[in-house]
Amino acid sequence: MDNLNFILPEIFISLSIMFLLLLGVYKKNSSNIVHNLAVGSLLITGILIFNNPLDQNISLFNDGYVVDNLSSFMKILTILGGAFVLSISTRYLKIFKIFLIEYPVLILSSILGMMVMISSNDLMVFYIGLELQSLALYVLASFNRDQLKSSESGLKYFVLSALSSGLLLYGCSLVYGFSGSTNFNVIGDLMNSSHYGLTFGIVFILVGLAFKISAVPFHMWAPDVYEGSPTAVTLFFAIVPKVAALTVFIRFLYIPFVNMIDQWQPILIFLSIASMIFGAIAAIGQNNLKRLIAYSSIGHMGYALAGLSTGSNEGIQSSIVYMSIYLVMNLAFFSCLLMLKRNDAYYETIDDLSGLSKNHPILSLSLLAILFSLAGIPPLAGFFAKFYIFKAVIEQSMYFLAIVGLLSTVIAAFYYLKIIKVIYFDKEKESYDTDHNIWLKGSLTFSTLLILLYFIFPSKLLEIVSRINII
């Protein structure tokens, strides 16, 4: 029974999913209730995670499931991201007539899958979590089934994700075949010498994981899926699954295969460099803001992978800090995007921001701070996120990676500054509606303040993350 206390968050969210589904089926017009209860369920799940003792490494189910500082922190990030997504998307879903009970249930299901992934210490447990997350995301991508683009994006994501899952499963089978176990700790104890079969297994698993975070060259799904999916779903895609996938990267590489760093480090460096360069260059020609943020997120994942490729605790911690700040920046950006509404129609191109500062000065100021932060301009939070990554990379004498990262940051700054130029210097268009959901306004205010004021108290986040020691 003591063990069950450590998985109470997962048990509670599982029961919540079943209860909300039954409530939605048996009670007519219950979308509002189910939606609000889903947000409440996530907040209670977060409280249950906080109740778990800190600085303890608890292993459950024959070491297949772990509860430690890394899992607790990343689960909190995932749950906060999910709660904000549900809170700010209600008006959008109602306008498109997709305010259904299935939406919060699918969000909760994918978050449950992510929580299992984050705590997994076994290839089988990890794969079960991954598939639970993916099955919910396939449906979410095509949730607005009356729109051709949404159905198309769901189908594209399903086909390509199924391919990546197949490669990942093949990699798992190779690792199991050559090590004789699926448990990360057992595999780590056996890994005194490298074997070509194991190296191939690692490569296949890394390919599958790279697809999940849309790292180059496995990014091809991201722009189309981001653009075609409903904006509320795109927001979820952009932030939450990547937190879980990055945690799996950390566990998979630094627990069973830390002794094989010579084999996987070059792969991670390649993924990082390719993602940073491609993400910076490909976004330049984009006019649709959702496609632009897709390419931007590819670049951001490159920076996160740069931290992981260092092979040091500092590198891992810098990547975790980067993902935390990335989540806040994207939440703020999409909050602004959901405010671009006029007569029940949403606008999502750069041209639609033309002269926004004349009619909506406060919204424009928020966008200014968010875009400067995404570009990595001091003293905003995005600058510190990149600073920690570059510091960790340079400490390991990986100068080429740091130079590529800096050059990519300069190139990426161009398209962020181009949007600011459109907002402040182009001719204004008809003003947008101002009667927004209080949660949407609160989300934008909260996330923008975090971006602006992070430099005053950066030590708090660093102090929490410094407790996460993997190596």
UniProtKB/Swiss-Prot annotation:
PANTHER family: NADH DEHYDROGENASE. One of its GO terms (biological process) is ATP synthesis coupled electron transport. Belongs to the complex I subunit 2 family. Its EC number is 7.1.1.-. NDH-1 is composed of 14 different subunits. Subunits NuoA, H, J, K, L, M, N constitute the membrane sector of the complex. This is NADH-quinone oxidoreductase subunit N. The chain crosses the membrane at residues 6-26, 30-50, 70-90, 98-118, 123-143, 158-178, 198-218, 230-250, 264-284, 292-312, 320-340, 365-385, 400-420, 438-458. It comes from Pelagibacter ubique (strain HTCC1062). It is found in: Cell inner membrane. Keywords: Cell inner membrane, Cell membrane, Membrane, NAD, Quinone, Translocase, Transmembrane, Transmembrane helix, Transport, Ubiquinone. It catalyses: a quinone + NADH + 5 H(+)(in) = a quinol + NAD(+) + 4 H(+)(out). GO terms for molecular function: NADH dehydrogenase (ubiquinone) activity; NADH:ubiquinone reductase (non-electrogenic) activity; quinone binding. It is a multi-pass membrane protein. It comes from the Bacteria. One of its GO terms (cellular component) is plasma membrane. NDH-1 shuttles electrons from NADH, via FMN and iron-sulfur (Fe-S) centers, to quinones in the respiratory chain. The immediate electron acceptor for the enzyme in this species is believed to be ubiquinone. Couples the redox reaction to proton translocation (for every two electrons transferred, four hydrogen ions are translocated across the cytoplasmic membrane), and thus conserves the redox energy in a proton gradient.
